[in-house]
């Protein structure tokens, strides 16, 4: 069995073995994920292999394992727009290669402090795509340099590339396939097979954690997979 196949099976098993009846004081488990939830009242449900999230404020959902070497992350995601209170067509975002310069190899050391507040992620080194950000007006790629936090704010997260055309903004209730690849000292970001972003990396700069980043919206997330390429 390949590592990527194992991750897919683990994802499904974590959901399938959840109890069908949940007492009022109990919550289903997010399994291999850590939530940093600004609101404290983020709601999620798990149906078969799909995670549904209703997010009142900022939320980062970190995959617990730190990824190293050459790898590909892939998943499907949909912005739900059915008239709900938090159904907002904006911010289908993600982090990858995330690290905390003050706590090398221990990204979750300041998880409670970050608490889903977007500015607090300026303390990290990472790669970031904000797809359909600014109320679905922009799709942007940035690289964060957390070492400049409280030193030089203008150098923390330079913009690498941006789209503003409708073809590269969000559509309601549409499923998207996301592929993030780190390989041969380069990273790429693809949506439905189209490469939107590419960036050369220094050796080891692609190592770190993946995080799904959401803001005041309602999403469905499934088919999460990690494939090690080396």
Spans of model-derived segments:
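Extracellular glycan-recognition regions
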Residues: 25-230
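Bacterial Sec-dependent N-terminal signal peptides
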Residues: 1-26
């Amino acid at each position: 069995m390949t590592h990527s196949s194992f991750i897919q099976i683990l994802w499904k098993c974590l959901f399938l073995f959840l109890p069908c009846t949940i007492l009022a004081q109990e919550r289903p488990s997010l399994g291999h994920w850590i939530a940093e939830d600004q609101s404290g009242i983020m709601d999620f449900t798990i149906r078969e292999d799909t995670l549904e999230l209703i997010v009142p404020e900022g939320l980062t959902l970190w995959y617990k394992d730190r990824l190293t070497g050459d790898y590909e992350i892939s998943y499907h995601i949909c912005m739900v727009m059915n008239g709900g209170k938090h159904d907002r067509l904006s911010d289908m975002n993600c982090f990858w290669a995330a690290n905390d310069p003050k706590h090398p190899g221990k990204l979750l050391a300041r998880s409670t402090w970050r608490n889903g507040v977007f500015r607090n992620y300026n303390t990290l080194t990472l790669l970031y795509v904000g797809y359909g950000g600014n109320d679905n007006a922009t799709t942007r790629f940035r690289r964060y340099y957390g070492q400049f936090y409280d030193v030089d704010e203008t150098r923390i997260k330079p913009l690498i590339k941006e789209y503003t055309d409708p073809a590269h903004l969000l559509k309601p209730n549409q499923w998207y396939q996301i592929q993030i690849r780190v390989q041969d000292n380069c990273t790429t970001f693809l949506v439905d097979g189209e490469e939107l972003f590419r960036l050369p990396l220094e050796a080891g700069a692609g190592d770190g954690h993946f995080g799904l980043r959401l803001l005041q919206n309602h999403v469905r997330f499934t088919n999460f997979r990690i494939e090690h390429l080396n």
